[in-house]
Amino acid sequence: KDEKIEELTDQLKRQMAEFDNYRKRTEKEKASMYVIGARDIVEKMLPIVDSFERGLATVSDSEDPFAQGMEKVYKQLMTAFDELGVKPIEAVGQEFNPDLHNAVMHVEDENAGENVIVEEFQKGYTYKDFVVRHSMVKVAN
């Protein structure tokens, strides 16, 4: 009788441990799905950020009310990105890192160090610890 109680107790403990592992695994999967979904949304919004930056770069009259309004909307968008954990990748002056940067050009430059980024063509971004878009850069050899 004691043997049967011990066996059933052991089975119950195993079942509880198995269920606990299942719960932890599903929580982890759910969190991962959220990050993947958010990353996809951020990726789809990056061309909008690029358009804002290109448009604002062409404005010569900073007193123009329309340009000021667009600047405010851009800043609001970038603040929201920052609060969500979306960060621009530092590029110019940094050492080339293939995990963060995509080298599209190489240049011989004695003034720049070996494998140092001298120009950024398109800004890259990370969301949490994931690269959403690599920076497109020119690297010195």
Model-derived segments and spans:
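Charge-rich, N-proximal long alpha-helical rod segments
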Residues: 1-53
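Structured alpha/beta interaction-core segments
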Residues: 51-141
